[in-house]
Amino acid sequence: NERLKRTLISSVGKLESIKRIADNEVSAMGERLRMLILTDYIKKENLAKIASAEEFNSVNIVSIFETIRRANLNVNIGVLSGSLVILPKAIDLSDVKHKKEDIANTDYCTVEFTGALHRGVDYVGKLFEEGKIQILIGTKSLLGEGWDSPCINSLILASFVGSFVLSNQMRGRAIRIDKNDPEKSANIWHLVTVEPEYLFKYKATERIYAYIKEDYKELHSYDYDILKRRFDSFMGPNYTMGTIESGIERITLIKPPYDKNGIERINEEMLKLSADRGEVKNKWRGEVADGSFA
């Protein structure tokens, strides 16, 4: 049913995936990392959970921020949205009108910029481009506020609602050419919740049968079904052949078995490949030059 689908799509387990990706990207890029994480909701009421032992039950700006902060990745994190801005206390804000409030027991503070919204958006964007923030978390509404930054070299799409056009717009944030870094290569991360088939059965007898006859050759995921449709219009190198193709089939690492160990294998291989940005650039350059499109 639709309620179950929404629950799976916004699975809190994705917070662990975001942390794992961030850790991997920090290890690969260090201070050169410019990671943007886009999501749907802010949830300011969760600010009270920061620097506490409380767990989160949904994916939103605050839960993503705190999950990464607790991981102690030795990077500066920022939050940018229409109603919530979080910045490291160490950043000098003396050249801009603002109000700020420290977040207890952390190195961060909430900031309220005085004046038009776009001024704060532009200011935080500049901090990001200058490397004073390595990981920036925001809502997809940023796309409608005139914010753009070609320095993005890692994008996590933790946004679970919206149209195909919006998905393309978000991807476009990462693939822009950066005149300050002509050799830039960006990773774009899509999060997928995979669940057993029996969860999608309506009758108890159907659920029991699906549980007993669990088939790990098939990938059961509402998330993945959406992603497959979107990948039909995304071009990229085939992971095995190297030719530039559309469709999710080009990501040849995604193969059965789709049990817990199989999914972990896929994730490990994805993380390993993502760290080699040079190889990604080589595949694009070689195949585009040769005209090897499929």
PLM features: residue spans?
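Conserved segment of the helicase C-terminal RecA-like domain
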Residues: 167-169, 173-224
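Conserved C-terminal RecA-like helicase domain
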Residues: 1-135
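A short acidic, often aromatic-flanked loop/helix-cap motif at beta-alpha or helix-coil junctions
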Residues: 84-89, 196-199, 249-254
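Long, largely alpha-helical accessory region at the distal end of helicase-like NTP-driven motors
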Residues: 205-294
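Conserved beta-strand termini and adjacent loop/short-helix elements that scaffold enzyme active sites
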Residues: 80-82, 191, 244-247
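Conserved nucleotide-binding/hydrolysis micro-motifs of P-loop NTPases
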Residues: 42-44, 84-85, 142-144, 161-163, ...
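Alpha-helical scaffold elements adjacent to nucleotide-binding pockets in ATP/GTP-utilizing enzyme cores
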Residues: 64, 151, 166-173, 226-230
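A short beta-strand element within the Helicase C-terminal
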Residues: 137, 142-160, 169-171, 184-191
